[in-house]
Amino acid sequence: MATLLKGAEVAKALTASLQGEVAALAERGVTPGLAILRVGARDDDLSYERGAMKRCEKVGIAVRQVVLPEDVTQEQLLGEIEKLNADPAIHGVLMFRPLPKHLNDAEARAALLPAKDMDGITDGSMTAVYAGTDAGYPPCTAAACVALLKHYNVPIRGKRVVVIGRSLVIGKPVSMLLLAEHATVTICHSRSQNLPEICKEADILVVAAGKAGMVGAESVRPGQIVLDVGIHANPDGTLCGDTRFAEVEPVVEAITPVPGGVGTVTTSILASHVVAAAKKTLE
């Protein structure tokens, strides 16, 4: 049986570390502040918002909810973003996407200051991730993958990593983050030829294809570390990932469960970005 790389342990350790950093900031008169900007009330947004607020409360981050109606105009949305950009009490902004179809997503992202972009949605943040600078923050889920590997002391340097998925949210940024850790990274996707054979060559396999049960026993071998980033609802209401867990788990060395794996770490990464942004105001 594989070792389960549970996210709760990682989140707990990150939270404890952040609490110390927040206490140090308080001594200098700074309280980290996060604004959660949400348009409408999508169920998945509300679920993540609850988790983020709970995590921030544990850490000591002040959270402000900015909730706009589903029919908000582009001008109203941009106005709220500008207010948050200018507010010194707000060190970071989490803007839920996708936005309703009548809104211009690219324009909204461009309006947000990269320094306050906590989830890597602006072009400035993406540039920082690809350039390897600390001028922005990567998407929380991508950063959670790396944090999880480091917490469990999984060697990354020099290792062969295969990432299935090429999205700007996970696939591409996690590849860049792992490359910065000196891994040898191959990016694959649903149209890659000989995908199972490529996957078997990996020491670390990151599955972020967004397709339930895409990877099974045919794509893994003993000794591998598997990070399953997907999360999907089965017809019976249970959750599953991008791997067929029952097939993969008996073969590999370690795997993240779904639920309870990578996703459990994301709100702690969000909190770490807010704290880092608050610390930069003292530089």
Spans of model-derived segments:
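Positively charged, low-complexity intrinsically disordered leader regions
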Residues: M1-V30
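Anion-binding alpha/beta catalytic cores of soluble intermediary-metabolism enzymes, centered on
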Residues: H91-I156, V161
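Short, well-ordered coil/turn residues at beta-beta hairpins
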Residues: F96, A208-A209, V229
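Short beta-strand elements in bilobed, periplasmic/extracellular small-molecule ligand-binding domains
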Residues: C56-E70, V185-I187
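Glycine-rich phosphate/diphosphate-binding loop of Rossmann-like nucleotide-binding domains
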Residues: V39-M53, G136-I225, N234, T238-E249
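Short beta-strand segments enriched in small/hydrophobic residues
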Residues: T31-G40
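Short, well-structured alpha-helical segments in soluble
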Residues: Q76-P88
